[in-house]
Amino acid sequence: MARKTPIERYRNIGISAHIDAGKTTTTERILFYTGVNHKLGETHDGSATMDWMEQEQERGITITSAATTAFWRGMAGNYPEYRINIIDTPGHVDFTIEVERSMRVLDGACMVYCAVGGVQPQSETVWRQANKYGVPRLAFVNKMDRTGANFFKVYDQLKTRLRANPVPIVIPIGAEDSFTGVVDLVKMKAIIWDEASQGTKFEYGDIPAELEGTANEWREKLVEAAAESSEELMNKYLETGSLDEDDINVALRQRTIAGEIQPMLCGTAFKNKGVQRMLDAVIDYLPSPADIPPVDGQDDDGNPIKRSADDAEKFSALAFKLMSDPFVGQLTFVRVYSGVLKSGDTVYNPIKGKKERIGRLLQMHANNREEIKEVLAGDIAAVVGLKDVTTGETLCDIDSHILLERMEFPEPVISQAVEPKSKADQEKMGLALSRLAQEDPSFRVRSDEESGQTIISGMGELHLEILVDRMRREFGVEANVGKPQVAYRETIRKNCDEVEGKFVKQSGGRGQYGHVVLKLEPLPPGGGYEFVDAIKGGVVPREYIPAVDKGIQETLPAGILAGYPVVDVKATLFFGSYHDVDSNENAFKMAASMAFKEGMRRASPVLLEPMMAVEVETPEDYAGTVMGDLSSRRGMVQGMDDIVGGGKTIKAEVPLAEMFGYATNLRSLTQGRATYTMEFKHYAEAPKNVADEVIAARGK
């Protein structure tokens, strides 16, 4: 089937922002102007289309990144039809995994900022993730109609806080109540939207006299930014003192895709102004799948290979999101990087080493769906009925294997015990938890061997609260949840140069004989676990060496101090012995486990606790109280910045163990006027008194 839309006219974009910058409203307006939605959805009355889980509509925050396809012909109807796939991303810090997951499959992003709040903590996290995946982006300053709105203040913050290189394409006409439209610096005309038509109609006019000086100054900066794209343009600019509209757009596009600049726009999504011009900027400056480099992967032998965004190439795709849908069951969202995927095809999953048959294919529009026959290179769609695919896995051509780079998912930092309320709930709970864990790789489920309890782990209190809530709503499971527990870790501080483990049972008949000598060394933070085989002269036969590694790995989940997982340790096997008849894999596994435990005891074992980066925005009157409170929680205050328009931002590093219930506490300290965000930073050694308490509590 021929393409309806050439690949050059595809845009895969994310709308990304801090929790209250108005991102969902912005996305809603995009859907409205692109003709998909005929009634505007508002987050605060719970009718927003993208926020399609019940809880999101109740809480007014976006949790899952729903993928939606929309079409756009330009605000003046002067473009051929473009196809825009929009991934809505959550703005709450507990859901950064969702942001990261969507960044991986996007080609470009619109970063939404509040004209009053500017660059907020989550904006910095999202910016870092976009840098990590090299995503070209543009900035949209929303809420220009709000009291305290200041476009140029946000411009300064983008430069200082994010080290961005924003290039305004428009500047606002007025602000707060008097915000009426924008000056388009490319066309050097004013754009005024018609309120009666909800912003679908607009007029170009002359630039207001009082803005001419400002407009000329910013136009000059815009043209200079364009001229810097090539020597040829720079010479043209120096000779003529100006550049025409086409030159400017081509040059800005080139520099945006290269990540050198970020076009910057503004408006108020709620009042239907400015989003239309932003959509034109998406088309003008953000890349199509054909503009980005081919995707990297490996063949079956681990050799690097690439696939281009071309229908004629062999099929490859990344499953980036799983969702349970009340009507069709399990949905797997895929981004097709190369080739074509048709319903009925059989594809290969190289991570599981299994074939999968593709059932129905759906193009999603927030919460309704259109069945399609095929998905072409560069497109995003949902597949129904995949049995064994987890988030972050590759699907590829059955005869031409490629393994795309896997996504990295952070380790959970908080755990809770969860118990079904009744026998009936017990059976359903297992299924519900495994389904949720499949959808969300930052959510883990395990069974505590000692207590027999089911332990769930995630990225924060809100994350777990929402998952327990989903269990109740979607799977009908009523459960009691225990107090949140911190995910401690154990490691060593010193080397243990030689430790022996011997597992011998020889009492007639077939015995057991395993003997190993290990050296243990601490690794730098984040080093995980490393095993080195340094056996000389076959004192431990080749076939038993994997068993030694496995024996140690099976010991890692439960350390010797308090039974927490062991991290950042390097184990070197350098000596041992064996018995011709009695040695076997199991004996070497046992010997390795014994040696490792003893080695840990001798190598100054310590308890590690998760440290959180906490950022509190508070009125100035309460800054001292907030800092004192953070210090009392063993926090290290790392700095304090002024918030433009009053107030302070306090940055601190605080152990997670001290942060439970902080939201309630902060509210009472500041009469509800402060807000905070918190994200995992790193693990650090717990002070002795804290470690002793934790170890004693685990020993009970």
Swiss-Prot record:
<dbReference type="GO" id="GO:0097216">
    <property type="term" value="F:guanosine tetraphosphate binding"/>
</dbReference>
<dbReference type="GO" id="GO:0005525">
    <property type="term" value="F:GTP binding"/>
</dbReference>
<dbReference type="GO" id="GO:0032790">
    <property type="term" value="P:ribosome disassembly"/>
</dbReference>
<dbReference type="InterPro" id="IPR035649">
    <property type="entry name" value="EFG_V"/>
</dbReference>
<dbReference type="GO" id="GO:0003924">
    <property type="term" value="F:GTPase activity"/>
</dbReference>
<dbReference type="Pfam" id="PF03144">
    <property type="entry name" value="GTP_EFTU_D2"/>
</dbReference>
<dbReference type="Pfam" id="PF03764">
    <property type="entry name" value="EFG_IV"/>
</dbReference>
<dbReference type="InterPro" id="IPR020568">
    <property type="entry name" value="Ribosomal_Su5_D2-typ_SF"/>
</dbReference>
<keyword id="KW-0648">Protein biosynthesis</keyword>
<dbReference type="Pfam" id="PF14492">
    <property type="entry name" value="EFG_III"/>
</dbReference>
<dbReference type="InterPro" id="IPR035647">
    <property type="entry name" value="EFG_III/V"/>
</dbReference>
<dbReference type="InterPro" id="IPR000640">
    <property type="entry name" value="EFG_V-like"/>
</dbReference>
<feature type="binding site">
    <location>
        <begin position="88"/>
        <end position="92"/>
    </location>
    <ligand>
        <name>GTP</name>
    </ligand>
</feature>
<keyword id="KW-0342">GTP-binding</keyword>
<keyword id="KW-0251">Elongation factor</keyword>
<dbReference type="Pfam" id="PF00679">
    <property type="entry name" value="EFG_C"/>
</dbReference>
<protein>
    <recommendedName>
        <fullName>Elongation factor G 1</fullName>
    </recommendedName>
</protein>
<dbReference type="GO" id="GO:0003746">
    <property type="term" value="F:translation elongation factor activity"/>
</dbReference>
<keyword id="KW-0963">Cytoplasm</keyword>
<feature type="binding site">
    <location>
        <begin position="142"/>
        <end position="145"/>
    </location>
    <ligand>
        <name>GTP</name>
    </ligand>
</feature>
<dbReference type="InterPro" id="IPR027417">
    <property type="entry name" value="P-loop_NTPase"/>
</dbReference>
<dbReference type="Pfam" id="PF00009">
    <property type="entry name" value="GTP_EFTU"/>
</dbReference>
<dbReference type="InterPro" id="IPR005517">
    <property type="entry name" value="Transl_elong_EFG/EF2_IV"/>
</dbReference>
<dbReference type="InterPro" id="IPR004161">
    <property type="entry name" value="EFTu-like_2"/>
</dbReference>
<comment type="function">
    <text>Catalyzes the GTP-dependent ribosomal translocation step during translation elongation. During this step, the ribosome changes from the pre-translocational (PRE) to the post-translocational (POST) state as the newly formed A-site-bound peptidyl-tRNA and P-site-bound deacylated tRNA move to the P and E sites, respectively. Catalyzes the coordinated movement of the two tRNA molecules, the mRNA and conformational changes in the ribosome.</text>
</comment>
<dbReference type="InterPro" id="IPR031157">
    <property type="entry name" value="G_TR_CS"/>
</dbReference>
<feature type="binding site">
    <location>
        <begin position="17"/>
        <end position="24"/>
    </location>
    <ligand>
        <name>GTP</name>
    </ligand>
</feature>
<dbReference type="InterPro" id="IPR009000">
    <property type="entry name" value="Transl_B-barrel_sf"/>
</dbReference>
<dbReference type="InterPro" id="IPR005225">
    <property type="entry name" value="Small_GTP-bd"/>
</dbReference>
<feature type="domain" description="tr-type G">
    <location>
        <begin position="8"/>
        <end position="290"/>
    </location>
</feature>
<comment type="similarity">
    <text>Belongs to the TRAFAC class translation factor GTPase superfamily. Classic translation factor GTPase family. EF-G/EF-2 subfamily.</text>
</comment>
<dbReference type="GO" id="GO:0005737">
    <property type="term" value="C:cytoplasm"/>
</dbReference>
<dbReference type="InterPro" id="IPR014721">
    <property type="entry name" value="Ribsml_uS5_D2-typ_fold_subgr"/>
</dbReference>
<keyword id="KW-0547">Nucleotide-binding</keyword>
<dbReference type="InterPro" id="IPR009022">
    <property type="entry name" value="EFG_III"/>
</dbReference>
<dbReference type="InterPro" id="IPR000795">
    <property type="entry name" value="T_Tr_GTP-bd_dom"/>
</dbReference>
<dbReference type="InterPro" id="IPR004540">
    <property type="entry name" value="Transl_elong_EFG/EF2"/>
</dbReference>
<dbReference type="InterPro" id="IPR047872">
    <property type="entry name" value="EFG_IV"/>
</dbReference>
<dbReference type="InterPro" id="IPR041095">
    <property type="entry name" value="EFG_II"/>
</dbReference>
